[in-house]
A protein has these predicted regions:
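Extended interaction regions within the primary functional domain
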Residues: 1, 9, 45, 158-165
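Weak global preference for isoleucine
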Residues: 1, 31, 35, 50, ...
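A conserved active-site cap/scaffold subdomain adjacent to cofactor or substrate pockets
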Residues: 25, 42-112
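Alpha-helical scaffold segments in soluble metabolic enzymes
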Residues: 8-16, 33, 37, 66, ...
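Phosphate/pyrophosphate-binding betaalpha-module
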Residues: 3-63
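Internal helical hairpin/lid segments
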Residues: 87-167
Length: 167
């Protein structure tokens, strides 16, 4: 269970020929579609987003560009150290004040525009993007990962008939 940050380790494990009795119970959710969905509701006035640094190390800062272009909202990828957060807030406020709506990367020591290309390639080989249920929100289109058919023999939800309910 997790986001783009934890999916590469699941993918890498499955790509390395685990034993037949190995199973995974996956519920990986995707951040950009969730942000897009929340903005589409039009119920909350937001001035910008501080984007998660660890997720962004995998997907890259470019993964959020379509959101700024579509919704005209500033976004800043920030790390988790106190100074990272403060600089991220400063960068976001500066964009708001200057009327800019783009994705900036405060967390340059860890996040690249393209993200972790190898991790993304592994995820693409192992997972399909599907609609997913989010606790307290409901189903968000194209916001989750499901194991591709070729990896279903490792899917614990199928092996052991485990039904997911909203957590």
């Amino acid at each position: 269970i997790g986001f783009e940050t934890t999916a590469p380790s699941t993918a890498a494990t499955l790509l390395n020929n685990p034993p037949e009795n190995f199973s995974v119970l996956t519920y990986h959710l995707l951040i950009p579609p969730a942000i897009d969905f929340l903005l589409s509701l039009g119920e909350v006035k937001l001035d910008g987003f501080i984007l998660p640094g660890h997720v962004s190390t995998i997907i890259g800062s470019n993964a959020y560009k379509y959101i700024s272009e579509k919704w005209h909202i500033p976004q800043v990828v920030a790390g988790f150290e106190p100074l990272d957060v403060l600089v991220g807030i400063y960068m976001l406020l500066k964009q708001v004040r200057e009327g800019r709506t783009e994705v900036e990367n405060e967390y340059v020591r860890a996040v690249r525009p393209e993200g972790n290309v190898k991790a993304k390639e592994m995820m693409k080989r192992v997972f399909d993007v599907v609609d997913a249920r989010w606790r307290g929100i409901g189903t968000i289109p194209c916001s989750g990962f499901k194991l591709k058919k070729e990896f279903e023999n490792f899917d614990a939800s199928k092996k052991f008939e485990i039904a997911f309910e909203e957590f």
